[in-house]
């Protein structure tokens, strides 16, 4: 069964996949989401966010005063919460579906990828390059307590962010996170 078909349980502090009992997103990720939003929104231009989760990064992106904010979400339960969240935001465009199979015509000044249960991550580098403006900022969920470049971007730098994760099976990170920073 694909992730989009799984039943999710929501609380203020996390989303749990009820089929696997794995945390999809947790509120302790807020410092990571804040720094990610600051990075991809430096130009205040057009931003693409792939994966809404609890909306933590989305709120930080909105606080940056960006021109436009496109959010792609595949899971119907999260999409329902996303549509409710976006209903009073004129600069937000919600797209339902799998980011890797959608036809995007726009280019973006900032791109953030934070998906769960995604079998298409091998396509992210080519996708990002094709959808980025010159000089676009890109970052993605790392899930490692080390510098990690699974998408084989030519040049990646990292910011080390202090975190205090709750005990979980979501990640092995304990004290810090390396936020990847790519400029295309």
Where are the model-predicted features located?
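Class I SAM-dependent methyltransferase Rossmann-like catalytic core
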Residues: 1-45
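Conserved class I S-adenosyl-L-methionine
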Residues: 43-53
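Conserved SAM-binding loop of SAM-dependent methyltransferases across substrates and taxa
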Residues: 54-66
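Conserved SAM-binding motif I beta-strand of class I
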Residues: 68-73
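C-terminal substrate-binding/active-site "lid" region of AdoMet-derived donor-dependent transferases
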Residues: 77-78, 104, 119-184
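Conserved SAM-binding loop
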Residues: 82-83
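Conserved SAM-binding strand-loop segment of SAM-dependent methyltransferases
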Residues: 89-98
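A short acidic, Gly/Pro-enriched loop at the edge of an enzyme's catalytic core
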Residues: 100-111, 115
